[in-house]
């Protein structure tokens, strides 16, 4: 598959600065550019690579002004990173789509399979499940009873979807993810712990992507809900009765305790932890390893554990390394004050 720089610019509503006829057939990082490749520059930290890259063309922002002469062809677009995503989606859509049911797969007779659906080797589709047009179930996927899988959704190898759960259209769920396992619900008693049956389900709305080995637990009752457009990295844990608002993104190892709720357009760094029964507003940003113990207002940016406003945390981080010396100084001052008090007391007599 090959395109000229001009064809790419036309598709992206951009403009060419250089050779519009240069032919491109692959992508490469700007620092590892090769002949015939397209790279991109969206971060100023990588600008110096532009002047030495071997890539034949580079996507840049419309307002980019080079500080040195550029030998490669530039394709100017409003947003280089977004344009790269758009272009790579186009290329990905041109790949041949798998279709048909492998002879080793099991599909219950009650399931109506669309003609263009793919069910891979040793996949298992249970009674009453519903599969949308163009969905793909890779080898060893398990789809439980009454599960609904939307149009164009992809379940990669070893994904497990428990009974009664719903997955929307155009979702991508990566290998090893478990949707709808029992929530961590136990009632303590004199003899130990009694299991609380988890009778709800999980609802995943359209255009959600879920990383490898992520677990989303079914609700005690009602539903655990992942709203439209959410993106979850690998190894994320979402407990029973939680909800994640539309277009929120979680980096790896985020953990939500039960019945916590996150708003729309939030961004959580890696290893963020939420205690149970709290609410996080819309457009909240949490730095890596932030721990939340209480509700958070919309628009907040927090860091640390427990989470505190970013500016306060940055100030505190300057002080933390000095605490041992400060403690010694305080002890010395307390000793001197005590001695002064004793002197004053003796002088009175």
UniProtKB/Swiss-Prot annotation:
Q: In which pathway does it act?
A: Bacterial outer membrane biogenesis; LPS lipid A biosynthesis
Name of the protein this chain belongs to: UDP-3-O-acylglucosamine N-acyltransferase
Q: How does it assemble?
A: Homotrimer.
Query: Which keywords belong to this entry?
Result: Acyltransferase, Lipid A biosynthesis, Lipid biosynthesis, Lipid metabolism, Repeat, Transferase
Question: What is the organism of origin for this protein?
Answer: Porphyromonas gingivalis (strain ATCC 33277 / DSM 20709 / CIP 103683 / JCM 12257 / NCTC 11834 / 2561)
Reactions listed under catalytic activity: a UDP-3-O-[(3R)-3-hydroxyacyl]-alpha-D-glucosamine + a (3R)-hydroxyacyl-[ACP] = a UDP-2-N,3-O-bis[(3R)-3-hydroxyacyl]-alpha-D-glucosamine + holo-[ACP] + H(+)
**Pfam name, any one:** Hexapep
| A GO cellular-component term linked to this record | membrane
């Amino acid at each position: 598959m090959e395109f000229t720089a001009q064809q790419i610019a036309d598709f992206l509503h951009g403009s060419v600065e250089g050779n519009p006829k240069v032919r491109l057939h692959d992508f490469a990082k700007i620092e590892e550019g090769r002949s015939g490749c397209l790279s991109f520059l969206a971060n100023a930290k990588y600008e110096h690579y532009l002047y030495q890259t071997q890539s034949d063309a580079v996507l840049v922002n419309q307002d980019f002004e080079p500080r040195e002469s550029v030998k490669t062809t530039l394709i100017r677009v409003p947003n280089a990173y977004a344009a790269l995503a758009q272009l790579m989606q186009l290329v990905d859509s041109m790949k041949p789509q798998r279709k048909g049911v492998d002879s080793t797969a099991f599909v219950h007779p009650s399931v109506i399979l669309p003609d263009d659906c793919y069910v891979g080797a040793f996949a298992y589709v249970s009674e009453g499940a519903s599969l949308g047009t163009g969905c793909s179930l890779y080898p060893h996927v398990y789809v439980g009873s009454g599960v609904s899988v939307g149009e164009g959704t992809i379940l990669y190898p070893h994904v497990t979807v428990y009974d009664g759960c719903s997955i929307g259209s155009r979702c991508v769920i990566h290998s090893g993810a478990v949707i709808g396992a029992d929530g961590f619900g136990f009632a303590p008693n004199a003899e130990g712990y009694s299991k609380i049956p988890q009778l709800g389900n999980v609802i995943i709305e359209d255009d959600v992507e879920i990383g490898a080995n992520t677990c989303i637990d079914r609700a005690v009752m009602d539903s655990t809900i992942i709203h439209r457009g959410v993106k979850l990295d690998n190894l994320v844990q979402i407990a029973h009765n939680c909800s994640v608002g539309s277009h929120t993104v979680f980096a790896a190892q985020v953990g939500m305790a039960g019945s916590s709720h996150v708003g729309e357009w939030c961004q959580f760094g890696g290893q963020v932890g939420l205690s149970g029964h709290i609410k996080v507003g819309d457009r909240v940003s949490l730095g890596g390893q932030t721990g939340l113990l209480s509700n958070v207002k919309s628009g907040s940016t927090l860091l640390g554990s427990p989470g505190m406003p970013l500016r306060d945390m940055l100030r505190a981080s300057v002080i933390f390394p000095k605490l041992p010396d400060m403690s010694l100084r305080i002890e010395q001052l307390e000793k001197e004050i005590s001695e002064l008090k004793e002197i004053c007391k003796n002088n009175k007599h």
